[in-house]
């Protein structure tokens, strides 16, 4: 049986727990101050049907959380490549896409920039809405947002490239 992500459940989770600054985050998970973005999208996908396993997991025990749960590049690598070892059908959980016309709610966006502040892939967010006026909107931790338009940050807001991680 293939792993299936319920996109609506992923968005419901994001809508419920997006505002980390007000303390509205799921207390069943650790919170990584100043660097919680990939932890947040991992929680969204876990709630929506992607099971935790020894290669993609989170823990309150220091050092026990996998990098694939919390680190931008490691999340992308796990979901689009090495997760195939953890699925019954041998396929990765997700695929990488580069075209914004091929995405929908529940997909993950990762931001890239080469600047003094960032050097490479540095931020993960989840698509929370496709708006008829603003287009792709996202929810995020670290810089908390619920329905922020992608157009606010890309291509003219400091983000120079985006990639999309989309469940199969």
Language-model-detected regions and their locations in the chain:
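N-terminal capping segments
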Residues: 1-70
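...with weaker cross-activation on analogous glycine-rich loops/strands in unrelated enzymes
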Residues: 61-138
């Amino acid at each position: 049986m293939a792993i299936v992500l319920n996109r609506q459940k992923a968005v419901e989770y994001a809508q419920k727990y997006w505002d980390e600054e007000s303390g509205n985050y799921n207390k069943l998970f650790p919170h990584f101050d100043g660097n919680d973005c990939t932890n947040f999208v991992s929680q969204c996908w876990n709630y929506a049907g992607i099971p935790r396993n020894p290669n993609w997991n989170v823990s309150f025990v220091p050092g026990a959380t996998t990098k694939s749960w919390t680190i931008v590049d490691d999340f992308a690598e796990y979901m689009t490549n090495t997760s195939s070892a953890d699925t019954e059908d041998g396929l990765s959980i997700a695929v990488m896409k580069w075209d914004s016309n091929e995405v929908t709610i529940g997909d993950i966006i990762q931001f890239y920039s080469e600047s003094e502040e960032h050097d490479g892939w540095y931020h993960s967010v989840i698509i929370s809405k496709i708006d008829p006026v603003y287009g792709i909107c996202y929810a995020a931790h670290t810089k908390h947002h619920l329905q922020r338009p992608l157009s606010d940050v890309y291509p003219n807001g400091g983000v120079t490239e985006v990639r999309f991680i989309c469940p199969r």
